[in-house]
């Protein structure tokens, strides 16, 4: 174990998360059809400020992320500041780390607080899979640029005459990795085969996720952290996540065909997280600032770590690389954790990471450690369900997990929690949270 790395300011203040909030998450082209991510971000930040009871003038900075970016609003963070009545002097910038984007936003805010450059800030993310940047072909794009420089109508017509019919077709956003051409689901399939993750085990984890998420909603455990959303034309309220299958069965899951490897695969729509719309944010500040404002902490950020690995194989093992670092920096072990929350991009990816957590061979050969961090106690794992059930608005998932874990730790009387996620590009994130 390496030496602990305390997350404190020069005055010894810890990093406080005062509050966290998210919109209900909705499957693509359902409740938020036509609502761009920037509007979802404005909705959640406005409500977070209202619930926190502090003046927006006190917010020094807003760090926000969006993975599927819209060309007309490339800096979503600044647009949220300008669209929510916050001070125009509030600093704002956007970040992107694929599925770990709001983890990055939280880390950036923490570093700014530690450096003393800000006292109070908001971190979060929003994504819409329903409002997408539909592009044009490279041939048409080049022609449009050239036509803009053409001096006469005849020159423009000559340029356009070279185009073929297929060049005029719209181009949807890529779903594959830019560097490899592999889809995330392809990597999930590879990991399932490499690590012997059966279809039955994947379906069982997916069912567990939906059952626990349904129970969390039924018991009212999520009501304080999920706002009611109203969107144009304001005819009805959006109250709950709409992806959770409250009465599904393994028999139903077993009927689905593989989604990626049609002949020999095991990854299906049921044991994968769906395309989702939503937003989430957290309010952060130094411990002394929270005390001065009379704001009780929801919890503390104890440590964080990011990792980067190969993209050709095992690209979704980021949690297995980032988690040991976060544990070391917090000065704790896996056994010290009260809760463990791992992003469920795919059941196969989740189960593969759990295997690597417990693998001494992986620890020695990949991490250079003498032994594994340990086997996960499933009674601590994703106790309210995970992304397979809730959905995955890419940039919002980290903030959802952080808020959900802190609230559940508080409900249980305190303790330490791990939140961790894989991300496209072979990236990983892990954070240790504490509730007293």
UniProtKB/Swiss-Prot annotation:
Q: What class of enzyme is it?
A: transferase
Q: Any one Gene Ontology biological process term?
A: fatty acid beta-oxidation
**Which SUPFAM superfamilies would you find in this protein's record?**
Thiolase-like (SSF53901)
What keywords would UniProt list here? Acyltransferase, Cytoplasm, Fatty acid metabolism, Lipid degradation, Lipid metabolism, Transferase
Q: Where in the cell is it found?
A: Cytoplasm
What S-S linkages are listed for this chain? Answer: none
One GO location term (cellular component) = cytosol
Taken from the record, one Pfam family name reads Thiolase_N
Q: In which pathway does it act?
A: Lipid metabolism; fatty acid beta-oxidation
- Its EC number is 2.3.1.16
Top-level taxon of origin: Bacteria
InterPro entries associated with the record? Ac-CoA_C-AcTrfase_FadI (IPR012806), Thiolase (IPR002155), Thiolase-like (IPR016039), Thiolase_acyl_enz_int_AS (IPR020615), Thiolase_AS (IPR020610), Thiolase_C (IPR020617), Thiolase_CS (IPR020613), Thiolase_N (IPR020616)
Q: How does it assemble?
A: Heterotetramer of two alpha chains (FadJ) and two beta chains (FadI).
PANTHER family with a match to the protein in the record: ACETYL-COA ACETYLTRANSFERASE, CYTOSOLIC (PTHR18919:SF107), ACETYL-COA C-ACYLTRANSFERASE (PTHR18919)
- HAMAP family reported in the protein's UniProt record: FadI (MF_01618)
Sequence similarity: Belongs to the thiolase-like superfamily. Thiolase family.
Q: What is this protein called?
A: 3-ketoacyl-CoA thiolase
What gene, per UniProt, encodes this protein? Answer: fadI
